[in-house]
Amino acid sequence: MAATRRLTRELSDLVEAKMSTLRNIESSDESLLMWTGLLVPEKAPYNKGAFRIEINFPPQYPFMPPKILFKTKIYHPNVDEKGEVCLPIISTDNWKPTTRTEQVLQALVAIVHNPEPEHPLRSDLAEEFVREHKKFMKTAEEFTKKNAEKRPE
């Protein structure tokens, strides 16, 4: 299966790359089509914790995009209450089979660091981000401290 070969190589490349904002990326014991990892943001307000993520690859990968899910709650306009992310690079309209998982994860880090209120999954948070930015940042930081995992050393 082409997906297996490619995912094996991509996972190996990601582990070797040692991105400071992504830790413990690994595939599940049951399937190479499901990865988990820890997102460790560097910018406020999310730099007070770490967020468990899950990446699910369809059997048709790389011809179909993966799906990313936050397993840790996050106060973010581009992530809904179920943990689903609005990430243009993995939308069916924008997906290209040449896109690598590392690029997807870099886009995820970028959207966490710089929310895009113009593409919200939570319009209430997008509005707060735009209209009451200081309040949003304070609430997001408190939410992160309360709900996020401890940051790795």
UniProtKB/Swiss-Prot annotation:
Q: Which reaction does it catalyse?
A: S-ubiquitinyl-[E1 ubiquitin-activating enzyme]-L-cysteine + [E2 ubiquitin-conjugating enzyme]-L-cysteine = [E1 ubiquitin-activating enzyme]-L-cysteine + S-ubiquitinyl-[E2 ubiquitin-conjugating enzyme]-L-cysteine
A Pfam entry, by short name: UQ_con
Q: Where is the active site?
A: C86 (glycyl thioester intermediate)
| Domain UBC core residue range list | 2-149
Q: Which GO terms describe its molecular function?
A: ATP binding; ubiquitin conjugating enzyme activity; ubiquitin-protein transferase activity
Q: Which PROSITE patterns match?
A: UBC_1, UBC_2
Asked if the keyword ATP-binding belongs to this entry, the reply reads: yes
The pathway noted for it is:
Protein modification; protein ubiquitination
| EC number(s) recorded for this UniProt protein | 2.3.2.23
Q: Which family does it belong to?
A: Belongs to the ubiquitin-conjugating enzyme family.
Q: What does this chain do? A: Catalyzes the covalent attachment of ubiquitin to other proteins.
Name of this protein = Ubiquitin-conjugating enzyme E2-18 kDa
Look up and give the organism this protein is from. Drosophila melanogaster (Fruit fly)
Lineage runs: Eukaryota, Metazoa, Ecdysozoa, Arthropoda, Hexapoda
